[in-house]
Amino acid sequence: MAEKNERAIKVVAENRKARFNYAIEDTVEAGISLTGTEVKSVRGGKATIAESYADSRGGEIWLINATIPEYLQANRFNHEPKRPRKLLLHRKQINKLMGAIERQGMTLVPLKLYFNEKGRAKLLLALAKGKQLHDKRETEKKRDWSREKGRLLRARG
């Protein structure tokens, strides 16, 4: 019998600073609307979501400031690297996110850009609140202490 070609989730870009700079309340998986050359560039692993954020415009959620560089093999039909990209969500999810942004002063921060099992580009969005400087220091102290604790336990045997 022929074996099935199992596709794993392939993470293309990750926003590692987001968990440090924001207190994450909730996460949502959103589809992302890309052109052909953008998909090829993302499959090559050349996307950056570190400085990006999501915002609502006209009842839709858009990914702003994400960088997907131009696809080198494309000619004149290439895309603009920093254009706003529409995120694909259900209306109920959009209303929930927009309400949290407007009422509670929260932010939509992208955490991961990846391809799911079906080969579709997905974005993991976090509904987050910005941390103050003392909160960031506290997080760093906890992380350092957990590392030190692990070292001490390993040293004792």
Swiss-Prot record:
- Give one Pfam family: SmpB
InterPro entries in alphabetical order: SmpB, SsrA-bd_prot, SsrA-bd_prot_CS
Identify the main location.
cytoplasm
Q: Which PROSITE patterns match?
A: SSRP
Cysteine disulfide partners in this protein: none
Does the record bear NADP in its keywords? no
The UniProt entry's GO biological process terms, in alphabetical order, are: trans-translation
Keyword vocabulary terms for this entry = Cytoplasm, RNA-binding
Subcellular compartments: Cytoplasm
Which Gene Ontology terms cover its molecular function?
RNA binding
Query: For bias kind Basic and acidic residues, which ranges apply?
Result: 136-151
| Region of interest called Disordered, as start-end residue ranges on this chain | 136-157
A GO CC annotation recorded here is:
cytosol
Query: Could you list the residue ranges forming a coiled coil in this record?
Result: none
Q: What NCBIfam families does the database record attribute to this sequence?
A: PRK05422.1, smpB
Which family does the record assign? Answer: Belongs to the SmpB family.
Q: What does this protein do?
A: Required for rescue of stalled ribosomes mediated by trans-translation. Binds to transfer-messenger RNA (tmRNA), required for stable association of tmRNA with ribosomes. tmRNA and SmpB together mimic tRNA shape, replacing the anticodon stem-loop with SmpB. tmRNA is encoded by the ssrA gene; the 2 termini fold to resemble tRNA(Ala) and it encodes a 'tag peptide', a short internal open reading frame. During trans-translation Ala-aminoacylated tmRNA acts like a tRNA, entering the A-site of stalled ribosomes, displacing the stalled mRNA.
Protein name (Swiss-Prot/TrEMBL): SsrA-binding protein
